[in-house]
């Protein structure tokens, strides 16, 4: 089983190498969406949650990226502990965790599990990073040291389907 997920956050960490236990370093989770697929690609489960902010606000610069304001999150959001328990349940069914720049999303969720003092196996799961796996496939010049650059999710989609997509639609 493959657990494919993405997060939206309050921003970026100060230090991408910091441990998830460094709570002040890692931004807060605003939204998480995931799909669980069988080994044959069958869609098994779909979840999408906006998190109700407790003890933080969503900066305007982050809102401009994902479209979720503090007001909206307070009105539509659910408790973080519920989200973490649901996500843990899906993790327990999976063999691989998949995402685009997955190390960022794993650290975001790891920090939230740490803050909530909820145990998880997320940090120990096998991962597939579509950003890294698709770099040679997309073959976009401009990477470091003469290598190809990492493709954005939009660039990967364009290469796979020969058409772009509107990222703003996924944050509704």
Where are these regions (language model features)?
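Short acidic, Gly/Ser-rich segments with clustered Asp/Glu that frequently serve as metal-coordination loops
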Residues: 7-15
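Metal-dependent phosphoesterase core characteristic of DEDDh/y 3'-5' exonuclease domains
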Residues: 2, 15, 26-68, 88-170
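Metal-dependent phosphoesterase signature
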Residues: 63-86
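Short consensus segments that form the blades of beta-propeller domains
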Residues: 20-26
């Amino acid at each position: 089983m493959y657990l494919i997920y993405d997060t939206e956050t309050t921003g970026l960490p100060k230090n991408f190498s910091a441990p998830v236990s460094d709570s002040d370093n890692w931004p807060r989770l605003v939204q998480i969406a995931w799909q669980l697929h069988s080994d044959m690609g069958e869609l098994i489960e779909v979840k999408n949650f906006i998190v109700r902010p407790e003890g933080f606000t969503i900066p305007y610069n982050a809102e401009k990226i994902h479209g979720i304001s503090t007001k909206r999150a307070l009105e539509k959001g659910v408790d973080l502990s519920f989200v973490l328990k649901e996500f843990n349940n899906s993790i327990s069914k999976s063999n691989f965790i998949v995402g685009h720049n997955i190390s960022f999303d794993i650290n975001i969720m790891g920090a939230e599990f740490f803050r909530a003092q909820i145990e998880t196996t997320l940090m120990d799961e096998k991962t597939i990073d579509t950003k890294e796996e698709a770099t040679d496939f997309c073959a976009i010049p401009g990477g470091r040291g003469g290598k190809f650059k990492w493709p954005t999710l939009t660039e990967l989609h364009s290469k796979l389907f020969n058409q772009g997509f509107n990222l703003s639609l996924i944050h509704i």
